[in-house]
């Protein structure tokens, strides 16, 4: 039995960061720390999910998140099945429910779901008897990304409370931003958003963030600079004049990074648009945590699956 095995979540599912209390977040991070060490060993196996079935149901393309959940499940001993559902064939509502009912009849133990519609994962969770993990729903939430970001920050800064984190770029379309804002706020960090007004949701200040319209102001003395991918596939209108102009004002390069704290570190959830929201010199530079974020992703998802496994019958 490992040290954090007594830790549990109040619910059967992980649908979002919203609703989690600070002790649940830190409990997951503490357990993930154990899995970071396990993943660096030659033998990377635990048996928490042996004999259990995990289905990854993704209606949006994803390389890193889906492969990360697959590796996490397999390292815990689960039988993992990947189901890719073309988003054109999954209509919001009826077809999703049909899919849920069909999958439920196969008696899976854990469903990991990504869907292009906000709220779809919570809808599906109400129709099945197994644990459900939200791997990203529309522009709503991406809880495991926020958890892996928090773990990365904590390992490098030693804490989260009291830090100033600047989240920059396409906040409007970003489920990563929303989950991170809620988590960081819950753990006592100061959160700034830096974006053009066209890429900010209305009323975002209600989440307890400061909003800035220039990188120079928003990055001033920030401890962490978190860049967001410009999600051009979700943009029907003209949200930005041009990619070149966007990079000029909001792309992170060495010059803009100098406005942050001298020991500021840089993050990006990936995939990156190099030369759009971040310069390669920064992304690949000594202050970048981007590769470490990917490593932390597997550990965090193992922690989530391990914790939910203890909610399963006969666990």
Curated annotation (Swiss-Prot):
<feature type="binding site">
    <location>
        <position position="92"/>
    </location>
    <ligand>
        <name>L-aspartate</name>
    </ligand>
</feature>
<dbReference type="GO" id="GO:0005829">
    <property type="term" value="C:cytosol"/>
</dbReference>
<dbReference type="Pfam" id="PF02729">
    <property type="entry name" value="OTCace_N"/>
</dbReference>
<comment type="similarity">
    <text>Belongs to the aspartate/ornithine carbamoyltransferase superfamily. ATCase family.</text>
</comment>
<dbReference type="InterPro" id="IPR006130">
    <property type="entry name" value="Asp/Orn_carbamoylTrfase"/>
</dbReference>
<feature type="binding site">
    <location>
        <position position="142"/>
    </location>
    <ligand>
        <name>carbamoyl phosphate</name>
    </ligand>
</feature>
<dbReference type="GO" id="GO:0006207">
    <property type="term" value="P:'de novo' pyrimidine nucleobase biosynthetic process"/>
</dbReference>
<dbReference type="InterPro" id="IPR036901">
    <property type="entry name" value="Asp/Orn_carbamoylTrfase_sf"/>
</dbReference>
<dbReference type="GO" id="GO:0006520">
    <property type="term" value="P:amino acid metabolic process"/>
</dbReference>
<feature type="binding site">
    <location>
        <position position="64"/>
    </location>
    <ligand>
        <name>carbamoyl phosphate</name>
    </ligand>
</feature>
<feature type="binding site">
    <location>
        <position position="271"/>
    </location>
    <ligand>
        <name>carbamoyl phosphate</name>
    </ligand>
</feature>
<dbReference type="GO" id="GO:0044205">
    <property type="term" value="P:'de novo' UMP biosynthetic process"/>
</dbReference>
<dbReference type="InterPro" id="IPR002082">
    <property type="entry name" value="Asp_carbamoyltransf"/>
</dbReference>
<feature type="binding site">
    <location>
        <position position="114"/>
    </location>
    <ligand>
        <name>carbamoyl phosphate</name>
    </ligand>
</feature>
<comment type="pathway">
    <text>Pyrimidine metabolism; UMP biosynthesis via de novo pathway; (S)-dihydroorotate from bicarbonate: step 2/3.</text>
</comment>
<dbReference type="GO" id="GO:0016597">
    <property type="term" value="F:amino acid binding"/>
</dbReference>
<dbReference type="GO" id="GO:0004070">
    <property type="term" value="F:aspartate carbamoyltransferase activity"/>
</dbReference>
<protein>
    <recommendedName>
        <fullName>Aspartate carbamoyltransferase catalytic subunit</fullName>
        <ecNumber>2.1.3.2</ecNumber>
    </recommendedName>
</protein>
<feature type="binding site">
    <location>
        <position position="175"/>
    </location>
    <ligand>
        <name>L-aspartate</name>
    </ligand>
</feature>
<dbReference type="InterPro" id="IPR006131">
    <property type="entry name" value="Asp_carbamoyltransf_Asp/Orn-bd"/>
</dbReference>
<comment type="function">
    <text>Catalyzes the condensation of carbamoyl phosphate and aspartate to form carbamoyl aspartate and inorganic phosphate, the committed step in the de novo pyrimidine nucleotide biosynthesis pathway.</text>
</comment>
<feature type="binding site">
    <location>
        <position position="145"/>
    </location>
    <ligand>
        <name>carbamoyl phosphate</name>
    </ligand>
</feature>
<keyword id="KW-0808">Transferase</keyword>
<dbReference type="Pfam" id="PF00185">
    <property type="entry name" value="OTCace"/>
</dbReference>
<feature type="binding site">
    <location>
        <position position="229"/>
    </location>
    <ligand>
        <name>L-aspartate</name>
    </ligand>
</feature>
<feature type="binding site">
    <location>
        <position position="65"/>
    </location>
    <ligand>
        <name>carbamoyl phosphate</name>
    </ligand>
</feature>
<comment type="subunit">
    <text>Heterododecamer (2C3:3R2) of six catalytic PyrB chains organized as two trimers (C3), and six regulatory PyrI chains organized as three dimers (R2).</text>
</comment>
<feature type="binding site">
    <location>
        <position position="270"/>
    </location>
    <ligand>
        <name>carbamoyl phosphate</name>
    </ligand>
</feature>
<dbReference type="InterPro" id="IPR006132">
    <property type="entry name" value="Asp/Orn_carbamoyltranf_P-bd"/>
</dbReference>
<keyword id="KW-0665">Pyrimidine biosynthesis</keyword>
């Amino acid at each position: 039995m490992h040290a954090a095995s007594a830790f549990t979540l109040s619910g059967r599912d992980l649908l979002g960061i919203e609703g989690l209390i600070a002790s649940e977040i830190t409990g997951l991070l503490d357990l993930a720390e154990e899995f970071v060490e396990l993943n660096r060993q030659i033998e990377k196996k635990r048996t928490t999910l042996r004999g259990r079935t995990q289905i990854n149901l993704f209606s949006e393309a994803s390389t890193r998140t889906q492969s990360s959940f697959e590796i996490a499940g397999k390292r815990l001993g689960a039988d993992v099945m990947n189901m890719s559902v073309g988003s054109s064939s999954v209509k919001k509502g009826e077809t999703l429910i049909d899919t849920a009912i069909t999958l439920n009849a196969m008696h899976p133990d854990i469903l990991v779901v990504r869907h292009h519609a906000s709220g779809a994962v919570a809808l599906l969770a109400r129709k099945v008897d197994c644990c459900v993990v939200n791997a990203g729903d529309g522009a709503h939430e991406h809880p495991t990304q926020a958890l892996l970001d928090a773990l990365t920050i904590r390992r490098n800064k030693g804490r989260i409370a009291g830090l100033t984190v600047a989240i920059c770029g396409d906040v409007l379309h970003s489920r990563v931003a929303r989950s991170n804002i809620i988590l960081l706020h819950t753990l006592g960090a100061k959160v700034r958003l830096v974006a053009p007004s066209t890429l900010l949701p209305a009323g975002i200040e209600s989440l307890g963030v400061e909003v800035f319209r220039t990188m120079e102001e928003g990055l001033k003395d920030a401890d962490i600079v978190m860049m967001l991918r410009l999600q051009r596939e979700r943009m029907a209108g003209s949200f930005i004049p041009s990619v070149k102009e966007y990079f000029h004002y909001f792309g992170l390069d060495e010059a803009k990074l100098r406005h942050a704290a001298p020991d500021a570190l840089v993050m990006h959830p990936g995939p990156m648009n190099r030369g759009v929201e971040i310069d390669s010199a920064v992304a690949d530079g000594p202050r970048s945590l981007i590769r470490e974020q990917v490593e932390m992703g597997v550990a965090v998802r193992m922690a989530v699956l391990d914790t939910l496994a203890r909610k399963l019958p006969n666990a």
